[in-house]
Amino acid sequence: MSNKLSQGWPAPAKLNLFLHINGRRADGYHELQTLFQFIDYCDYLDFKVTDTSSLKLHSNMGAAVADSDNLILRAAKLLQQVSGCAKGAEIWLDKRLPMGGGIGGGSSDAATTLVALNHLWNTQLSKDKLMAIGLQLGADVPVFINGLAAFAEGVGEELQAVFPTEYWYLVLIPNVHVSTAEIFQDPELPRDTPKLDIASLMNGSWQNDCQSLVAKRHPQVAKTLLWLLEYAPSRMTGTGACVFGEFEQQQQALDVLAKLPSDMTGLVAKGANTSSLELRLAQL
C-alpha cells in the first residue's frame, strides 16, 4: 500500500442544532448540552502511506490553513504514538469549509485523518479508542469519529445517538472570526439554561446560548441572522460565525440563496444523521 493514493476521504461539516450552557464547573469548563447533525458539505483528504514515519501535508490554501494543518499532523502523530505504527503518510487537504465558522472544519479534518490512517496503516484501533485520541485534539473531534448525529452533554464528550429531521439548510458564512475562548470567558454569556432530558429533547425549545453575545460583539453576524430570519427559522452554529436556516425542500433553500446580498456568502446542504465519513468507512 506504500505507493497507492487513497483519495476522497470526506471531512464533513456539522451544525449545532442547539447549544445550551447549563453551568460552569469548578475547573472552569462549561457544562453544556448540544445536538450535532452533519451536513453533506465537506473538506476532502487524500492519503499515501509511506514506509518511513515521516508525515507531510499539502493543502490548496497554503499558510491560510495553519490551524487545520496542526490538527491533521497532530492527529497522525498521536495515532503513531498510541499504536506504535512505524509507517508515515503524505496527506493532501482540499479545504472547502470555512475556518473558525462553528461548523467543525479543523476538528473534522483531524477526525478523518485518524479514521483514514487507522484503516490505511492497519492499526486496528476501535472506534472508542480513536474517539479517546480525538478528545485530546478537541472537544468536537469524537463527534466526527463517531459519525452519527448525537445529543452531547458534559463538556461535550458524552454522546447519545439521536435522529433529528434531515432538513435542507442554507448556511451563511459571515466574514468574521469568532474566538471560542473569548466567548466562553465573557461574563455576559448565559450559563443557567435548564437541562433537557433525552425524552423531551425533540419537543424542547432550541436556541444557541452564545448567539446574542456573538451578535453583539460581531455586527456582521447580527446582520446575517436578521436577513436569514426573514425566510426561515435560523440560528447560529457553535460559537459562530456561521448561521443556518432550515427548509423542507432543497429548492426553497436555493431560492433564498439566489436572493443573497452581494456582501454575503453561503451554501445549501442537506442534513445527515450518518456522516459521509461513516458511509465511506462502511463501503471498505
Curated annotation (Swiss-Prot):
The UniProt entry, under InterPro entries, shows:
GHMP_kinase_C_dom (IPR013750), GHMP_kinase_C_sf (IPR036554), GHMP_kinase_N_dom (IPR006204), IspE (IPR004424), Ribosomal_Su5_D2-typ_SF (IPR020568), Ribsml_uS5_D2-typ_fold_subgr (IPR014721)
> What EC number is given for this enzyme?
2.7.1.148
Active site per UniProt: 14, 140
Q: Which Gene3D superfamilies match?
A: 3.30.230.10, GHMP kinase, C-terminal domain
Extract the signal peptide range: none
The molecular function terms in GO held by this entry are: 4-(cytidine 5'-diphospho)-2-C-methyl-D-erythritol kinase activity; ATP binding
Task: Give binding positions for ATP.
Answer: 98-108
Pfam families linked to this entry: GHMP_kinases_C (PF08544), GHMP_kinases_N (PF00288)
Listed A to Z, the keywords are: ATP-binding, Isoprene biosynthesis, Kinase, Nucleotide-binding, Transferase
- State which pathway it belongs to: Isoprenoid biosynthesis; isopentenyl diphosphate biosynthesis via DXP pathway; isopentenyl diphosphate from 1-deoxy-D-xylulose 5-phosphate: step 3/6
Q: Does the keyword Glycoprotein apply?
A: no
HAMAP family, alphabetized: IspE (MF_00061)
Q: Which family does it belong to?
A: Belongs to the GHMP kinase family. IspE subfamily.
Its function, per the record, reads: Catalyzes the phosphorylation of the position 2 hydroxy group of 4-diphosphocytidyl-2C-methyl-D-erythritol.
- Name recorded for this polypeptide: 4-diphosphocytidyl-2-C-methyl-D-erythritol kinase
Organism, by scientific name, is Shewanella sediminis (strain HAW-EB3)
The taxonomy runs: Bacteria, Pseudomonadati, Pseudomonadota, Gammaproteobacteria, Alteromonadales
